[in-house]
């Protein structure tokens, strides 16, 4: 998983469970939920990003080539 990857969410309690989002950034500092994922649709409170742990994500497409 790297910046720009398309990922499927595997966290059952998430609003975006089984949905696909784009990795916005990855924090290397050692925190548990280090991957920020951006989505096309917003959740109930109008937010379109969330932090996930790497083991809660399944990469479905690599980042687009520049």
From Swiss-Prot:
Chief location of this protein within or outside the cell: membrane
SUPFAM superfamilies: Electron transport accessory proteins (SSF50090)
Compartment list: Cellular thylakoid membrane
Top-rank lineage group of the source organism: Bacteria
Pfam families with a match to the protein in the record: PSI_PsaE (PF02427)
GO biological process: photosynthesis
Gene3D superfamilies registered for this protein in UniProt: 2.30.30.50
InterPro entries: Elect_transpt_acc-like_dom_sf (IPR008990), PSI_PsaE (IPR003375)
Membrane topology: Peripheral membrane protein
Keyword presence, Membrane: yes
Gene Ontology cellular component annotations, sorted alphabetically: photosystem I reaction center; plasma membrane-derived thylakoid membrane
Keywords, sorted A to Z: Membrane, Photosynthesis, Photosystem I, Thylakoid
Function: Stabilizes the interaction between PsaC and the PSI core, assists the docking of the ferredoxin to PSI and interacts with ferredoxin-NADP oxidoreductase.
Similarity comment text for this entry: Belongs to the PsaE family.
Protein name: Photosystem I reaction center subunit IV
Lineage of producing organism: Bacteria, Bacillati, Cyanobacteriota, Cyanophyceae, Nostocales
Gene: psaE
């Amino acid at each position: 998983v790297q910046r720009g990857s398309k990922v499927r969410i595997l966290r059952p309690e998430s609003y975006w469970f089984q949905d696909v989002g784009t990795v916005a950034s990855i924090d290397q500092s050692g925190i548990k939920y280090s991957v920020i994922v951006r989505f096309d649709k917003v959740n109930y409170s109008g937010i379109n990003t969330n932090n996930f742990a790497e083991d809660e994500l399944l990469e479905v497409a690599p980042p687009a080539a520049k």
